[in-house]
Regions:
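Carbohydrate transferase catalytic cores enriched for Leloir-type hexosyltransferases
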Residues: 1-230
Length: 230
């Protein structure tokens, strides 16, 4: 992984070695990572739609939303397009999360269908996660079983504008929106507006255990996204 000084939020891994590689932004994918792969004769499995420059690889494109929806800033869309092209040029095989995306990727990027596989989103790992009730220490205004819960970023396609509008129409109700709030790729208007809704609480990043606690104790789970790869 690219070691840029930020903390890693990972569970205990027994059979996977974590290798930090010092790199500055795009040099990681363009220079540092390919050099490491060649040196160790390694096969690359890219799970985050990252740009790559090695043919011994498979890549996951969760979806290609930035190419079909106008919800991102121009530079992010250009960067994502370049990532997709590098996947087309170098990856031996591509995986995505639905048959809908499989056909869309083939249509938009010109990748043959027989080169694109489908691996559905997983949830089974949560069965072995213990709920971490300490998350409520960060939410003193939230009562168990009396709030509505949503999880994700504040990116435009997640449609959290809908949650904010519903919260504004129901000031007696409580809402919790967990997840990252970094809108560098989307602009700050949504974040500024969201912070002005007093009955919405933002715990920020939550662990799997904290997420499970919030899901188990909410009155209802909200998922207003208009695009998730299916």
């Amino acid at each position: 992984y690219r070691d840029d000084g930020r903390p890693l939020h990972l569970p205990e891994l027994k059979n996977i070695k974590i290798v930090p590689l010092k790199a500055i932004k795009y040099s990681y994918n363009l220079v540092v990572l390919p050099r490491y792969l060649r040196k160790h004769h390694a096969f690359y499995v890219g799970l985050a739609s990252d740009m790559l420059m090695t043919r011994r690889s498979v890549v996951v494109l969760h979806d290609i939303r930035p190419l079909v929806m106008d919800t991102d800033k121009g530079f992010f869309r250009f960067k994502f397009w370049f990532h997709c092209l590098s996947t087309k040029w170098f990856a031996r095989r591509v995986f995505t999360v639905s048959d809908n995306q499989r056909h869309l990727i083939s249509e938009r990027l010109g990748i043959p269908l027989d080169k694109i596989g489908v691996t559905y989103n997983g949830w089974e790992h949560l069965q072995n996660v213990q709920p971490d009730m300490t998350v409520f220490d960060k939410l003193p205004g939230v009562k168990k079983k009396e709030y509505y819960y949503a999880l994700g970023s504040l990116a435009g396609h997640k449609n959290f504008k809908w949650v904010r509008e519903v919260a504004a129409r129901n000031p007696d109700k409580t809402f919790v929106v967990a997840g990252g709030k970094d809108l560098a790729a989307f602009g700050s208007a949504e974040a500024d507006a969201a912070q002005n809704t007093s009955n919405i609480f933002y715990p920020g990043y939550v662990t799997d255990g904290q997420n499970k606690a919030l899901m188990q104790n909410c009155k209802g789970f909200l998922h207003p996204a208009v695009f998730e790869g299916f």
